[in-house]
Every structure is written in structure tokens, then in C-alpha cells.
């Protein structure tokens, strides 16, 4: 179940303040945030936001296609090591 429309999208207050300040001055700086749950709003388009994935900050450039999604969707938290090689498995079974 999603968030109620009457409440509006959740955006971290401090993150929103930083975005608005950069929009007023016209600066383009990378903004570090730990708020993965914040929704991307039209004011953020064109900015680069470094989203924390539990280990480091991943820079995410915000485009119009991302509006309505959460910041955390663009900074994966898990590493995929890959599936085991089938040839290696067969060789182990024969020995």
C-alpha cells in the first residue's frame, strides 16, 4: 500500500532545503544524503545527489524519468558476485 495522496511525497526536510538553496543560487554541487526513502521531485532534476548505500555514497544524476521514484532505487545495497560457473561445477563432480 502506497502513501496517501493527501499527504504528498516524502522528501527529507534538510535535503529539500539544500536543493532549494542550490536552485536559488544556480550552483551545481553534489549533495550527500543518507535519505534513501526520499522521493524524487521536479525540483531535483539536473542535480547530482550522492545516495548512501551502506558502504559509500553513490552519485546519482537526476533526470525527468526518475520523478516519482525513491533515491534508494538508484543506489544498490547488495553486491552480486555472479552465479557459479557450470563448467567448474561439472569438473568438481567428476573428480
Curated annotation (Swiss-Prot):
GO terms for biological process: ribosomal small subunit assembly; translation. GO terms for cellular component: cytoplasm; small ribosomal subunit. Pfam families: Ribosomal_S19. This is Small ribosomal subunit protein uS19. InterPro entries: Ribosomal_uS19, Ribosomal_uS19_bac-type, Ribosomal_uS19_CS, Ribosomal_uS19_SF. Keywords: Ribonucleoprotein, Ribosomal protein, RNA-binding, rRNA-binding. Belongs to the universal ribosomal protein uS19 family. The keyword RNA-binding applies. The gene is rpsS. HAMAP family: Ribosomal_uS19. GO terms for molecular function: rRNA binding; structural constituent of ribosome. The keyword Protein transport does not apply. Residues 82-95 have a biased composition (Basic and acidic residues). Protein S19 forms a complex with S13 that binds strongly to the 16S ribosomal RNA. Residues 76-95 are annotated as: Disordered.
Amino acid at each position: 500500500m502506497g502513501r496517501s495522496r493527501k499527504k504528498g511525497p516524502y522528501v527529507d526536510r534538510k535535503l529539500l532545503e539544500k536543493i532549494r538553496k542550490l536552485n536559488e543560487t544556480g550552483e551545481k554541487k553534489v549533495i550527500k544524503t543518507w535519505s534513501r526513502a526520499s522521493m524524487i521531485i521536479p525540483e531535483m532534476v539536473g542535480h547530482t545527489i550522492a545516495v548512501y548505500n551502506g558502504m559509500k555514497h553513490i552519485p546519482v544524476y537526476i533526470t525527468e524519468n526518475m520523478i516519482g521514484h525513491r533515491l534508494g532505487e538508484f543506489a544498490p545495497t547488495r553486491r552480486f558476485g555472479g552465479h557459479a560457473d557450470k563448467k567448474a561445477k561439472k569438473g568438481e563432480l567428476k573428480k
